[in-house]
Amino acid sequence: NGKRMILGTSVALSEAEVHWRTFLSSLRERGIGIPDLVTSDAHEGLKSALKATLNASPWQRCQFHLQQNAQAYIPKVSMRQEVADDIRYIFNARNRPEADMRLNEIVEKYSKSAPDLARWMENAIPEGLTIFAFPENIRRRLRTSNMCETLNSQIKRRTRVAGLFPNEASILRLVSAILMDISEEWESGKTYLPQISSN
């Protein structure tokens, strides 16, 4: 129906693979099917858990995180805006062949002036192009993990008020209540994903 839905919640001390694997396995055990797409950052623990539990699902590396990650490979501060614009130029292509062509063009552009950046782009940017396998009218919503980041920010903001928690169960209760409220808002709110078109 195009509505967002929270499928589960978990409390863990880290983003280690074992925690993600446990969470994703619990979703599978509850009967959640194989997703058509998983969008996330490139955290190694999460990537390993996805391979172990949802290997059949295509993975889209969050384009926003890719933009941020590129900063580490830019040799001069004065190049930051240009590089950001070039990455956006790739992401805003009409289709995958055009995105690949633009990527090759940009990699070539930086091969001499910023070889580490060019190598990083060549290896990392394709992970953010999986979205081109999906209809154009839903790509914008699925190309980043911003929805999850916003959700996590809301949880942090509302749990910070409570301060310290005596045990894991108490924080899980509060987080679950917060997520139930948000889920109800989503269910009664606007459609998040438009009906899929064939083009």
Residue ranges and their predicted role:
Residues S10-W20, L24, R28-E29, V77-Q81, ...:
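A detector of single, family-specific signature residues
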Residues R4, V38-D41, L50, H65, ...:
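Mobile genetic element proteins and their domesticated derivatives, centered on retroelements
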Residues S14-R21, S40, E44, Q81, ...:
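Conserved structured core elements
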Residues L37-E44, A49-D86:
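Conserved beta-strand -> loop -> alpha-helix junction used to position metal-binding or nucleic-acid-contacting
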Residues N1-T39, E44, S48, T53-A56, ...:
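RNase H-like nuclease fold core
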Residues A12-A16, V38, C62, P75-M79, ...:
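A generic short alpha-helical patch detector that favors 3-5-residue windows
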Residues Y89-N199:
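Acidic/histidine-rich catalytic cores and adjacent linkers
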